[in-house]
Amino acid sequence: PDEDAFIRTCEALVEAGHTVTEGSADNAKRRCVTAFATVVDPSGNTIELYWGRELDYTPLISPQGVAGFVTSYQQTGDMGFGHLVLPAPDFDATSTFYTEIIGMGITDILYPPGMEGAKIHFMHANNPRQHSLALFNAPHPLGVVHIMIEVETMDELGRGMDRAKAAGAHFMATLGRHVNDNMCSVYLLAPGGIAVEFGYDGILIDPQTHVATVSTEGDLWGHEYSFPGVED
């Protein structure tokens, strides 16, 4: 959140044996931040740390008329763009990297039904979003399992589904509701091959008092998956 925290985190990474590369001033300017650094986690995912975002406070004007996306709480608190799921074949070391060094907390541990040996750690930052990051204990050819963006109403979700259908997008999962974060969502295949979860109604947690849970079911209902090139 500030320069001191940025420096402390970079120093902790170096102390733990990770190589931290400082970003150039030009690249920081392109990212609209004061400074940033890159590091590779134990599973080979490159991440960036930064501080000092530049803001112009221009409101979002969606070309599709979306009223807004859920990125804050109580009008001021920052919850980020949504969430990101990364592949983590070196699972234990990668989970430790994000919890012990980066400082995230475990929200939920999921053992997906029908996927022998699979495990997902859902992690929260210092804000009420149920998870901002999740780690899946398997490699992924694109380096990203999926991203999630959240809209403010069920009608916005429905209109987005209509636009996706009209555009011929592949639905990787039908409408459903997850168990752990209560998100009502669909999964779409983006042109680059990354899955995008488009959701509504995710729960909020207290990151200071939340106690991690263990789930053996992924969904309350729905979310019938259909992967391209995979026959039933």
Residue ranges: model-predicted function:
Residues G52-L55, G114, G202-L204:
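A short acidic/small-residue loop/turn micro-motif
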Residues P1-T46, A88-D92, I149-V196, Y200-P207, ...:
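Vicinal oxygen chelate
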Residues G17, T21-A35, W51-S72:
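Asp-box/WD-like beta-propeller blade repeats and closely related beta-sheet repeat scaffolds
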Residues N27-A28, L86-Q130:
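Core segments of cupin and vicinal oxygen chelate
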Residues P141:
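Long C-terminal interaction/binding lobes of large macromolecular proteins
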Residues V33, G80, G117, R129, ...:
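Exposed loop/turn and edge beta-strand positions of beta-sandwich/beta-sheet ligand-binding modules
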Residues D56, L60-D92, G105, V144-I149, ...:
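N-terminal beta-strand motif that seeds the catalytic metal site of vicinal oxygen chelate
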Residues E48-Y50, T96-T99, T107, F122-A125, ...:
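A structural feature that tracks compact, well-ordered secondary-structure segments
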